[in-house]
Amino acid sequence: MVRSGNKAAVVLCMDVGFTMSNSIPGIESPFEQAKKVITMFVQRQVFAENKDEIALVLFGTDGTDNPLSGGDQYQNITVHRHLMLPDFDLLEDIESKIQPGSQQADFLDALIVSMDVIQHETIGKKFEKRHIEIFTDLSSRFSKSQLDIIIHSLKKCDISLQFFLPFSLGKEDGSGDRGDGPFRLGGHGPSFPLKGITEQQKEGLEIVKMVMISLEGEDGLDEIYSFSESLRKLCVFKKIERHSIHWPCRLTIGSNLSIRIAAYKSILQERVKKTWTVVDAKTLKKEDIQKETVYCLNDDDETEVLKEDIIQGFRYGSDIVPFSKVDEEQMKYKSEGKCFSVLGFCKSSQVQRRFFMGNQVLKVFAARDDEAAAVALSSLIHALDDLDMVAIVRYAYDKRANPQVGVAFPHIKHNYECLVYVQLPFMEDLRQYMFSSLKNSKKYAPTEAQLNAVDALIDSMSLAKKDEKTDTLEDLFPTTKIPNPRFQRLFQCLLHRALHPREPLPPIQQHIWNMLNPPAEVTTKSQIPLSKIKTLFPLIEAKKKDQVTAQEIFQDNHEDGPTAKKLKTEQGGAHFSVSSLAEGSVTSVGSVNPAENFRVLVKQKKASFEEASNQLINHIEQFLDTNETPYFMKSIDCIRAFREEAIKFSEEQRFNNFLKALQEKVEIKQLNHFWEIVVQDGITLITKEEASGSSVTAEEAKKFLAPKDKPSGDTAAVFEEGGDVDDLLDMI
């Protein structure tokens, strides 16, 4: 399609002859494909908000309506729309009024009519570009008698030309279709493979090649497109065109050095130019709606107050401070005008990336045609680059604007050099948050295997691909080439609503989703690391304890007496959860929810405490053998359940023996990370204060968790050699 830039005059010349409706079953006809391409191009132009004008010429129509027709010349060619700005009316015409014809017309005659439209309808208007686009299947007969005149006129009038065909200039097997890219739209492939075209189409294709090579040499063949390729390229709305306007100013360093500069907006957050407005629901005209604002006192009569009797107020806490327009003007900062003053310099490492703010980035160049300014600014840029430093700058757009503080850092390319300015925050712009470190808790500290798995995942998801031959990096996900999906969706919905006022809005187009998905190469590479992540970070259901009702606590039981009621209250009220509803099916301690299974078994006495505890201990040892933090946490839950139930059922000695044996096994297997979690959670021996059957004091329980000092090498040697206590004292 015509390249964006200055104002252009574009003629869309579409073949609507009866052969355009022929197609292979299951594939759209060339007529429908051409219609889609034209629709997409026009809607891009409508929302691009530029000044390009578009005309529409149809050939192969049943009637004839063009200024060159006469006798049997230029028949079945219609100028459907003259040169003017594109709008929704044109889109509606393309959708509903353009229908296949029953005739055929010479595409070279249609080209001459299109040239005539451009030549006559651009008189008195200033266009930088003149362009014709022809959509045809080349099936109609044509005359080559005026071919040289056509080529000469195109060159003389500086009219560029493009052809759009249902096939492409690929290999003989048709595999060269440029529409066969990774984003090719399903069902929009070329209607005819190149090897299946007719002799008439082959002859027409040779004429098209001859014309394009005569106009632009071998590069002219690049201006012959297939419908499928065009649909892929036009599936996104064209970005709104913005022309760069330079901002002249003086870069000052101190009071004696001044450099004339011109700054351009390099990056600016884009906003939709057209805004929402209120119109009459029936006439759809803004003029039919009048808006009137009335101010009234908050009294019973709602007394009207004139606008002149109202001043604004600033709410400060619960008070309102009156602040008139005069006060507001006096409060405003009074500057001398536009400003770009260097406050000082610092190392580039001191300005961290997270401090960049604002909604624009400026590129600062020397003023045009000022050689002294160019030399001075170039010296500053190279000095900053050599010293790895940046300039801290005071920036004010004009005398009405509040000043900013920003950073200007050197930017040197092979064909230009400049300063790049980015705004920096003031104190009030910073948001300070304090978070506790995850390293403080041994419970949540990742293992080495988990860290390596996450590292592998990050490496596999890298969006930069290195080319080993050229030693360069290729960006697999260039965000600067991805259109804003918000704009795409807005334009899609506005277009649909304009053409179909009563139909519901369409779903988001699939190509928009595809643009936002990670590249297929990255997705494939990350599958293996992702599966390892799932293995090393298992999801364990965190069950929330439900509130216990009186009915659930005091349920019917054949045992009578205060002892039975007391036992039921203690056992039922302490650990009730949703899983307890399925207690009847628990016959042993399982590996999925061992702590809860253990509680159910000892509570319902389906197994002896000794048998249930042995099953629980077996699972604890299995979890520890995995040497993985998630299973360590499961073991902690089991130990905690064992301790609580042991106190209830007077089995404190059994738990204490287990915990002592566990400590020895942890030391042998060097599971220091697990024991740190035990110590951190304070899981120790059951003391006689907690259960009367225990002989462990609180001091002994505390000492049990205290870290043990490792004996020195000499001390260990004494015991190995059979030394007694006196020998040990002599060594000390």
Curated annotation (Swiss-Prot):
Class of enzymatic activity (EC top level): hydrolase
Compartment(s) where it occurs, according to its Swiss-Prot or TrEMBL record: Nucleus; Nucleus, Nucleolus; Chromosome
**EC numbers:** 3.6.4.-
Of the GO CC terms on this record, one is: DNA-dependent protein kinase complex
What keywords would UniProt list here?
A: Acetylation, Activator, ADP-ribosylation, ATP-binding, Chromosome, DNA damage, DNA recombination, DNA repair, DNA-binding, Helicase, Host-virus interaction, Hydrolase, Immunity, Innate immunity, Isopeptide bond, Nucleotide-binding, Nucleus, Phosphoprotein, Ribosome biogenesis, Systemic lupus erythematosus, Transcription, Transcription regulation, Ubl conjugation
Top-level taxon of origin: Eukaryota
Q: What is this protein's expression induced by?
A: In osteoblasts, by FGF2.
Report domain Ku positions.
253-452
Q: Post-translational modification, briefly?
A: ADP-ribosylated by PARP3. Phosphorylated on serine residues. Phosphorylation by PRKDC may enhance helicase activity.
Domain comment, as recorded: The EEXXXDDL motif is required for the interaction with catalytic subunit PRKDC and its recruitment to sites of DNA damage. The VWFA domain interacts with the KBM (Ku-binding motif) found in a number of DNA repair proteins.
Q: Which family does it belong to?
A: Belongs to the ku80 family.
Misc. remarks from the entry: Individuals with systemic lupus erythematosus (SLE) and related disorders produce extremely large amounts of autoantibodies to XRCC6 and XRCC5.
**What's the name of the protein?**
X-ray repair cross-complementing protein 5
